[in-house]
Amino acid sequence: MVSRAGLASLLGASFLLLLARSAEPLGFSHRPRTAGGELSAAPSRYLAREERWMSQRLDHFSSSDHRQFKQRYFEFLDYHDDPTGPVFLRICGESSCDGIPNDYLAVIAKKFGAAVVTPEHRYYGKSSPFDSLTTDNLRFLSSKQALFDLAVFRQYYQEKLNSRYNRSAGFDNPWFVFGVSYSGALSAWFRLKFPHLTCGSLASSGVVLAVYNFTDFDKQVGDSAGPECKAALQEITRLVDKQLLSDSHSVKALFGADSLKNDGDFLFLLADAAATTFQYGNPDALCSPLANAKKKGESLVETYAHFVKDYYIKKLGTTVSSYDQEYLKETTPDDSSSRLWWFQVCSEVAYFQVAPKNDSVRSAQIDTRYNLDLCKNVYGEGVYPDVFMTNLYYGGTSIAASKIVFTNGSQDPWRHASKQKSSEGMPSYIIKCSNCGHGTDLRGCPQLPFRIEGDSSNCTSPEAVNTVRKQIVKHIDLWLSQCHEPARAW
């Protein structure tokens, strides 16, 4: 999911999915090849980066609007030795899609001899239908339109394969879809809405539940931090809230964020910075300095300010401006991911990371009113997240589908918007370790910075990760084999 900083910071510097600003080893050892098929001297973080294009319909729900836009996608065929072998559709989410990541999906693809294809999400990166991102132009940005994009792309690429191998138009490779976070939700929803187009789905940290007041997010941040670190964060919040009343400019300048005039925007930045460490498996980066400062009697606020500037902003590439509502109002920003994702938040899924009434880590000023005011200020009247209708359409955590694997890291605040309990045909796994966060099954530990092939050796419990990975492969193997049966059991 995206953090305020925008998912571009994350997939670009990895993948920042915090809310509103806001896919491992099985014993396979190999040296990944480049997209051109040559063995590389050192593993790359991408399997493929060569851009390919297709024409996509702007509005799939209109019979009279025939406008189209160019959608970018990538393909990796090095492991696809059997033309009848599976195709893995890896879904890109709420950020620019600059290639196919060389994470644990690469290991799975090699095992199954799969082709890997990745289309970029409409509006993000280079797949935008419009030069100007006005609210009116954003009305075609939704998960529903994105799912039809995936269906059209799937059919387009299948026809492309059939033509390449001189096959009849009716031939169908077995397809399997993958996604992490919001794209994990899209993966599950694609299997729900288009079961005839895929043999199964992996929804890694798939946030399938639209949530209006997402208080469980902050509660999980506190739980993941542990008593000592949580208490330090709460003390920092109390002191910063107090300093904002007496000298807001000075305290914002301390964090390098004096450009943020809205106190809520500033407080959201501070909350995101803390949450990111647990979401992406780096708890010690935050909690160790705070514990040392507490022990030495040093300023917790100054220590946290150093962390925000050195880790969240400098190391992860977060920009302070992405938290500024005035920046979010820009219709032609240099990095549009934040404005785009916030529109999806404000119009469809909410995920409002508000402070719980009691024992909150984040400031109480980050409440429902703050989020609603942001939506109105940035996009105007009439943009409102109808989470009831979203959950009615997809089913939320009661999704009535089959052959979907749900996975979540135990420390990830986003897991409370995912399906955490298994049901018939939809196994769910919680990967338990102290640095198992967002997309651990595909990304390894920590989840940021990027780990080649989703290396799990730095997880506090590699076995916990690898056990779930074995289960994922087991389900993929079974469901792909059922796709090959004459009756093609869905």
Across the structure, where does each feature detected by a protein language model lie?
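A catalytic-pocket lid/entrance helix-loop region that shapes and gates access to the active site
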Residues: 196-299, 303
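Conserved alpha/beta-hydrolase
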Residues: 111-128
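C-terminal subdomain of alpha/beta-hydrolase-fold enzymes, centered on the catalytic histidine
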Residues: 265-490
